[in-house]
Design a protein with these regions (language model features):
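Short, Lys/Arg-enriched N-terminal segment that forms or immediately precedes the first helix
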Residues: 34-48
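Structural motif
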Residues: 45-54, 182-185
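Short, flexible active-site loop motifs that bind/organize anionic cofactors or intermediates
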Residues: 46, 64, 90, 133, ...
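Exposed alpha-helical structural elements
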Residues: 22-26, 35-36, 83, 99, ...
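Short, positively charged, Gly/Tyr-enriched micro-motifs
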Residues: 49-116
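Glycine- and acidic
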Residues: 41-43, 60, 205-207
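Polybasic low-complexity intrinsically disordered regions
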Residues: 102-242
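Charged, often Cys/His-bearing segments associated with DNA-binding zinc-finger transcription factors
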Residues: 1-38
Length: 243
């Protein structure tokens, strides 16, 4: 793991002052992804290596850091930005949309390795920040599907979103004048369930479900998952809050 002494943990002002490329460099250096890279490289074997596994993975990370909401936007950024291509590890050649889509499909087949990377990062935070995980909060967030409505055609062809369904969240509060308000949000897609450190606002455990899955049901599942994967944090937690 690379050490960058000039940056202190949670010094967000320092991170925000960095450019996108520098932030991406930090992500690439600190990401505990070696096991996943070896698995993907072994699967590729001695086949064509037009777009190296590690370069493709770094490009995927770049899409997250640069907040691109589609593969097409990321690939256009790679095409115009030589520094980004170099940092990712491409030797001047930008992946085709088909090649990148195929790589994403490969990564999705290795959810266990991806979740282990996440757990490793959480454990590293626990080592560095002694009170990390003492104050926990649980919540969920709507993730809209690209499809406007649930697809009635259940035949899988690699293009349709067959797993998305409908969800609803109700928000309530009180105005300054004492009157009550209510806001109902409906969407088609998924739901991201999170257990986070309430002090540092960093995730500790997560799951993604269909939008219709009730928060309370998945909360029990997340706590069981946390007991299995992060037992020390759960044992030392003092507070768990939720809506």
């Amino acid at each position: 793991m690379a050490i960058i002494p000039q940056l202190s943990l949670f010094a967000w002002e320092e991170i925000e002052e960095l450019g996108d490329l520098e932030r991406l460099r930090l992500v690439i250096e600190y990401m505990p992804d070696e096991q996943l890279m070896r698995v993907l490289e072994k699967e590729r074997g001695k086949g064509r290596d037009d777009y190296p596994i590690r370069a493709m993975w770094n490009a995927l990370l770049a899409g997250i850091v640069f907040q691109h909401d589609s593969d097409a936007k990321l690939l256009r950024e790679l095409a115009r930005n030589g520094q980004l291509r170099s940092l990712c590890g491409f030797n001047g050649k930008v992946p085709t949309p088909w090649a990148f889509s195929r790589f994403l499909h490969k990564v999705l087949m290795h959810q266990a390795e991806v979740e282990e990377m996440f757990d490793d990062l959480v454990r590293e935070l626990k080592k560095i920040v002694p009170d990390f995980g003492k104050r926990l909060a649980i919540d969920s967030k709507a993730i809209k599907s690209y499809a406007a409505k649930k697809n009635k055609n259940e035949k899988e062809d690699g293009r349709r979103d067959l797993d998305a369904d409908y969800g609803k969240k109700v928000y309530r509060g009180t105005r300054e004048d004492g009157t009550r308000w209510e806001k109902i949000v409906k969407w088609c897609g998924y739901k991201l369930h999170l257990i986070v450190d309430a002090s540092y606002e960093l995730p500790i455990m997560f799951s993604v479900t269909k939008a219709s899955v009730p928060d309370i049901n998945e909360a029990h599942h997340l706590l069981e998952k946390m007991e299995e994967r992060q037992p020390e944090i759960l044992k030392k937690a003092e507070i768990l809050t939720g809506d």
